[in-house]
């Protein structure tokens, strides 16, 4: 059993939040899975899911992107949305560390935006994508902005700026590094994942 906080919009586009208990049954065999990756767009609920999975399975949880980004951000004196100012070498170094974790660790819930993408072809990895979409598959950006504002106790304006700028900056950087500048590439492409929640 796992408890997940869900949100959706009603007809007026206001967020309706609820907690839902979901019986996961046996979504994967833990004897063949060494690592579960959890990825999602900013404030989609990926951290909540990763923490709950780690607690439920008794596995270690690493929030890799935040640990990495916070250290780099502080060292370079950048604000949270200035991911475009992070040197490419920092991303490449992080990818090497992430690859080593994906190849060697066990009983780990690894949460980073690129974890599912980077885990392609690695044995023993179960890749989860957390989305915040309406019934038509459209991203619910305003809900994610509201979630970020509530979670970090920021103004809605600051949260909106962070979500929109940081996502754009991340995608621009990663498209350059990993997708030959393909303007359609995203790390949240559902084909990279074993399960989409």
Question: What positions do the PLM features span?
Answer:
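ATP-dependent small-molecule kinase phosphotransfer cores
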Residues: 63-123, 138-142, 146, 153-162, ...
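Small-molecule kinase domains that catalyze NTP-dependent phosphoryl transfer to phosphate-bearing small molecules
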Residues: 154-197
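Pre-Walker A (Motif I) flank of P-loop NTPase domains
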Residues: 32-35, 106
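Phosphate-binding P-loop
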Residues: 26-32
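Post-Walker A helix-loop "phosphate-sensing" segment adjacent to the P-loop in P-loop NTPases
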Residues: 55-62
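Glycine-rich phosphate-binding P-loop
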Residues: 38-51
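Short glycine-/polar-rich loops that comprise or flank the Walker A/P-loop
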Residues: 122-126, 191-194
């Amino acid at each position: 059993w796992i408890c997940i906080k869900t949100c959706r919009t009603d007809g007026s586009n206001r967020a309706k939040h609820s907690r839902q208990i979901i019986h996961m049954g046996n979504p994967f065999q833990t004897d063949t899975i060494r690592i579960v990756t959890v990825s999602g767009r900013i404030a989609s609920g990926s951290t909540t899911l990763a923490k709950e999975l780690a607690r439920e399975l008794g596995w270690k949880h690493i929030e890799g992107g935040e640990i990495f980004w916070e250290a780099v951000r502080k060292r370079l004196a950048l604000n949270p949305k200035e991911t475009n100012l992070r040197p490419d070498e920092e991303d490449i170094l992080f990818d090497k560390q992430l690859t080593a974790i994906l190849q060697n660790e066990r009983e780990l819930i690894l949460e980073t935006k690129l974890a599912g993408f980077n885990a392609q072809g690695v044995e023993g990895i179960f890749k989860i994508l957390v989305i915040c979409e309406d019934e038509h598959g459209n991203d619910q950006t305003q809900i994610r902005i509201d979630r970020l504002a509530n979670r970090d106790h920021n103004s809605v304006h600051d949260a909106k700026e962070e979500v929109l700028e940081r996502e754009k900056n991340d995608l621009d950087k990663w498209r350059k590094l990993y997708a030959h500048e393909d303007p359609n590439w995203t790390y949240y492409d559902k084909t990279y994942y074993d399960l989409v929640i």
